[in-house]
Amino acid sequence: MPQGDHIELHQKRFGRRLDHYEKVRKKTARAAHKRSAIAQKVTGLKAKLYNKKRYSEKAEMKKTIAMHQERTNKKASDDKVKEGAVPAYLLDREGVSRAKVLSNMVKQKRKEKAGKWDVPLPKVRAISEDEMFKVVKSGKRQKKAWKRFVTKVTFVGEGFTRKPPKYERFIRPTGLRFKKAHVTHPELKSTFYLDILSVKKNPQSPTYTQLGVITKGTILEVNVSDLGLVTQTGKVVWGKMAQVTNNPENDGCINAVLLV
């Protein structure tokens, strides 16, 4: 028989360990993993009893959660609605409010913006993954096939460094890496050889955009500082969008039209 609550007495006198609450927190965090491990290992009658116990615990937990959620749940009130009552969202129906005018202005601006970025090639042919990538076999016995060789033109940027070849999933060959493009200004009817700053959007897939793959219809950002274009406030325009209009992998060069 126990001769006294000596543990509780010691805690009252000297307090707990400095890391006690941290240990308790970690123990509770590990509890779920421990339970899972036991449930996976246990077999036979023990498994049946354990599963029955967990089933009842979960049912109890669901009831408790439901009780707590009752406070936040919104229910339809039984009170009768008075005659002539108008809901809050219909209160401003009498006159056109300032908010509505602003909303219409915003919509109009969006329409203008959408029209502003009409592109020369609104639709392009879909490119299959087999056409875009070539499977590269690797490993001692050439049995691994997780590497891909990009067969289209790419842009990798100025400070690009390859990953170690052993771990590189997408191989972008040096011969298909381009840094410049022939960009035609639609209003000036003249072509300029400009630096590519980045690949903004490849219409095929976000993955290709991330890899910097350039296909027909891709939107590029090009350096137009040499053209001397200025904004309405007088600032020099540095980068502008252009859409690729040819198949660079076939032609060996990138032809694009500037989006003015």
Swiss-Prot record:
Iron keyword on record: no
Motif Nuclear localization signal: positions: 11-18
GO cellular component: nucleolus; preribosome, large subunit precursor
A biological process term (GO) from this entry: maturation of LSU-rRNA
Subcellular location: Nucleus, Nucleolus
Coiled coil spans: none
InterPro entries: NSA2_fam, Ribosomal_Se8/biogenesis_NSA2
Major subcellular site: nucleus
Keyword Iron: no
Key words of the record: Nucleus, Ribonucleoprotein, Ribosome biogenesis, rRNA processing
Pfam families membership: Ribosomal_S8e
Superkingdom in the source lineage: Eukaryota
Family: Belongs to the eukaryotic ribosomal protein eS8 family. Ribosome biogenesis protein NSA2 subfamily.
Subunit and partners: Component of the pre-66S ribosomal particle.
Role played: Involved in the biogenesis of the 60S ribosomal subunit. May play a part in the quality control of pre-60S particles.
Protein name: Ribosome biogenesis protein NSA2 homolog
Species for this entry: Dictyostelium discoideum (Social amoeba)
